[in-house]
C-alpha cells in the first residue's frame, strides 16, 4: 500500500515537471526576421532613399524604437521595454526592406529561439514601416 502511494506520488511529480517544462517552452519562438519585404507607394513616382529612411525612422519611433543610421541603406533599431532590450538591423533599398535580429538582453535568445514577445515587436515594426512607406 505504501509502495503504491509512493509510485503514484512519483508519477504526479513527473507529470507536473513535464507540464512546467512545456509551459516554459511555449514562451519562446523561432526568431522572426523579415526578408526583402516589398514596398508600395501612394504615387507612381519612386521615393528617394532618404524618404524611405525617414519613413522607417518615423514608423519605428512611433512604436518606441530608437532608430539610428549605421550606413547608407542600413539602420539600427533598439527597443527597450522594462528590463528587455531588442536590437535589429534594418536594411532598405527603394524596392524593399529587411529586419534581422542583431542582439538582445533578457529575451532568452539561444541562437534560434527567443522570447515570444520579440516576434510581436518585429511584426508590429514591419506593419508600421509598410503603412508609413505607403503614404510616401
List where the protein language model places each region.
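Sec-dependent N-terminal signal peptides
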Residues: 13-20
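Helix-centric, low-specificity signal for extended rod-like, repetitive segments
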Residues: 2-3, 20, 46
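C-terminal motif of bacterial Sec signal peptides marking the signal peptidase cleavage site
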Residues: 22-25
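Bacterial N-terminal signal peptides that target proteins for export
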Residues: 3-13
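Ser/Thr-rich, low-complexity intrinsically disordered terminal regions
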Residues: 27-136
